[in-house]
């Protein structure tokens, strides 16, 4: 019986750790806006998915000291996120089912985007290119749609 408990616990630990991951990124060193040399982007891109049939596509390119975090819980959630902005963050949280988000932040230095969708069949489209800016979208319930553009 003890062996069965240990095996069950090990299966939970292994399956739980397979659900989370950090995605490696590449960005050039060299000079960047006269700021001197950099050995890398010094940024993080993390995707955490819990449940089933969730999908995430993320690109973080030439985004120094930036952070992108996608967390999806439930079933059938989708995310398409792109960032190419220095000192900026994107945080996407989707809980429920069939929520979809498309988020793009390019050339928007020192900017933040936060999107939270809770429920089902919600959709968000966010585009930001304005520096020193922030966008926040929060949707709770079912069948909500939001579009936010900040240039």
Swiss-Prot record:
It is found in: Fimbrium. The keyword Mitochondrion does not apply. InterPro entries: Curlin_rpt. One of its GO terms (cellular component) is pilus. Residues 1-20 form the signal peptide. Keywords: Fimbrium, Signal. The keyword Lipid biosynthesis does not apply. Induction: Constitutively expressed in agar-grown cells (at protein level), part of the csgBAC (agfBAC) operon. GO terms for biological process: cell adhesion. It holds the Pfam family Curlin_rpt. Belongs to the CsgA/CsgB family. Curlin is the structural subunit of the curli. Curli are coiled surface structures that assemble preferentially at growth temperatures below 37 degrees Celsius. Curli can bind to fibronectin. This is Major curlin subunit. It comes from Salmonella enteritidis. The lineage of its organism: Bacteria, Pseudomonadati, Pseudomonadota, Gammaproteobacteria, Enterobacterales.
């Amino acid at each position: 019986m003890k062996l069965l408990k240990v095996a069950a616990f090990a299966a939970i630990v292994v399956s739980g750790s397979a659900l989370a991951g950090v995605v490696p990124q590449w960005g050039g060193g060299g000079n960047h806006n006269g700021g001197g040399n950099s050995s890398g982007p010094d940024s993080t891109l993390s995707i955490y998915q819990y449940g089933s049939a969730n999908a995430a596509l993320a690109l973080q390119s030439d985004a120094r000291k930036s952070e992108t975090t996608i967390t999806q819980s439930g079933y059938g959630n989708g995310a398409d996120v792109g960032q190419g902005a220095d000192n900026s963050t994107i945080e996407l949280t989707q809980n429920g089912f069939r929520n979809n988000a498309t988020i793009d932040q390019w050339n928007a230095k020192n900017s933040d985007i936060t999107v939270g969708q809770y429920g089902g069949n919600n959709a968000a489209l966010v585009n930001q290119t304005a520096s020193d800016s922030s966008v926040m979208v929060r949707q709770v319930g079912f069948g909500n749609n939001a579009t936010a553009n900040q240039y």
